[in-house]
């Protein structure tokens, strides 16, 4: 599991995740992800296009981070999940808690 952070126009931070958000993958990036997303209140796009699998521990990480940002006045948008990952998120009802869109560009528009 890998995480990469890039700055987008509009003071938006893009966190690109690549790999499997299973037990091992989540443990491999959880501290870095939490540090990136809790350093400051802001606008974050979590790019899930590179995530091939999502387990409950990965869902917990995403929800915890989004709630933390919301509590500080920030916002998180999940972007571009692959069909399997989208299905897991929708089945778990995460799309009702955290905005989820089809592309990074749509996420930027949501955060504008």
What is each stretch, according to the model?
Residues 99-103:
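Short acidic-hydrophobic, aromatic-tinged amphipathic segments that line or gate anion-handling sites
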Residues 106-112:
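Short, charged, intrinsically disordered terminal tails
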Residues 83, 105-106:
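Acidic phosphotransfer microenvironment of two-component signaling modules
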Residues 23-98:
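Amphipathic alpha-helical interaction surfaces in cytosolic regulatory modules
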